[in-house]
Amino acid sequence: FGQQKLLELAMALMNEPKMLLLDEPTAGINPTLINGIIDRLIKVNSEYGITLLVIEHNMRVIMSLAQKIFCLAHGKMLAEGSPDQIKNDKRVVDAYLGAQ
């Protein structure tokens, strides 16, 4: 399934977009392949200047990939900021990572 996701990404890049909207790009992928997807998405952004708008529930993925994160909870904006700001935001920790 990971190879199919990579093929879909390659097909999307054929049109030379300025932005890609990715809805859970790592969903259903073997955890060992997720890092490869993340690396390729980072390369797409850094080398080709393509903006990535990623909808993702896997916090590890989004923390590795994003420069700016918007967290929603129950359909409302919960927090926004850098990965460091998000992982240290008590509201996000309570909602997504479990209260500490």
Put a short name on every predicted segment:
Residues F1, L9:
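Hydrophobic anchor residue at the start of the ABC signature
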Residues I62-S64:
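A short, surface-exposed alpha-helical micro-motif characterized by mixed small hydrophobic
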Residues E56-H57:
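H-loop/switch region of ABC-family ATPase nucleotide-binding domains
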Residues E16:
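Conserved catalytic motifs of ABC-family nucleotide-binding domains
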Residues L20-E24:
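Catalytic Walker B motif of ABC-type/P-loop ATPase nucleotide-binding domains
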Residues N35-E47:
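Helical segment within the ABC ATPase nucleotide-binding domain
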